[in-house]
Amino acid sequence: MIARILDGRTCAEKVKARVKENIRLLQEKGLPSPGLAVILVGNDPASATYVAHKERACQAVGIRSTVYRMPNTITESELASKIDECNRDSNTHGILLQLPLPAHIDSANLLERIRPDKDVDGFHPYNLGRLVQRRPALRPCTPYGVMTLLTETHENLEGKHAVIVGASNIVGRPMALELLLAKCTVTVCHRFTRDLAEHVKSAELLIVAIGKPGIIQSEWIKPGAIVIDVGFSRLSPNKIAGDIDFETAKERASWITPVPGGVGPMTVATLLENTLQAAQTFL
């Protein structure tokens, strides 16, 4: 068995085309284009690269993006003031606080300070609570991007045993909520999980989001499983790896995402979707 490839780039282009068309329709009605404020703290090269990629994606679909670059020495109260300013700005429909933040800043406090209806990352407790209640509003970008990508398989997810490896607030936990919403039976594995291999072997849908290359051995993968690799590690300037060895895993899976080119493009595409949704709430 050789797995079919879940191409995140192709799927993301479909999402972006829909967003672009909806923005064109807004403009035809004389309504403003969606506006996104991105707050970038410090000089982390990876964060700067991600923000530049998001800027280009916004420009391609017609979203106005403004990047506020803050020094690494900024205080939490100063950063809170910038968020408050964006909250008040009627031309800003979405706010993205680029993570990670410097160690002296409590990111949870600041994420909660963003207005829920401008929280295009979907991290505010209000938006997570809506997801818990099965009444989603703005949804966390990576998990929802994965769900959109899964529609490309045309597989019925109801009743499938989904195993998530990783329990972060950004991916693992909201991913579990999305899969419950899709009527999967969900197991979440984390650092204290015993017999990780046995859990993975039972997965009909496997989602791995740890950031440790090779943490999942290919022989653990159930033949015919759908495999989603959210991991992203830069091993060298020209080499990127996921959490699973793609070449060996694709011989067991029915569908598999590559790294790069799998989940990453879907995260950005979902951010654009969320920004449009936030703008439509205002307009």
From Swiss-Prot:
GO term, biological process aspect, one: purine nucleotide biosynthetic process
Partners and quaternary state? Homodimer.
State the protein's name. Bifunctional protein FolD
NADP as a keyword?
yes
Q: What does this protein do?
A: Catalyzes the oxidation of 5,10-methylenetetrahydrofolate to 5,10-methenyltetrahydrofolate and then the hydrolysis of 5,10-methenyltetrahydrofolate to 10-formyltetrahydrofolate.
Q: Which organism is it from?
A: Coxiella burnetii (strain CbuG_Q212)
Keywords for this protein:
Amino-acid biosynthesis, Histidine biosynthesis, Hydrolase, Methionine biosynthesis, Multifunctional enzyme, NADP, One-carbon metabolism, Oxidoreductase, Purine biosynthesis
UniProt-listed InterPro entries: Aminoacid_DH-like_N_sf, NAD(P)-bd_dom_sf, THF_DH/CycHdrlase, THF_DH/CycHdrlase_cat_dom, THF_DH/CycHdrlase_CS, THF_DH/CycHdrlase_NAD-bd_dom
- In the UniProt record, which is one GO cellular component term? cytosol
A Pfam family this protein belongs to?
Answer: THF_DHG_CYH
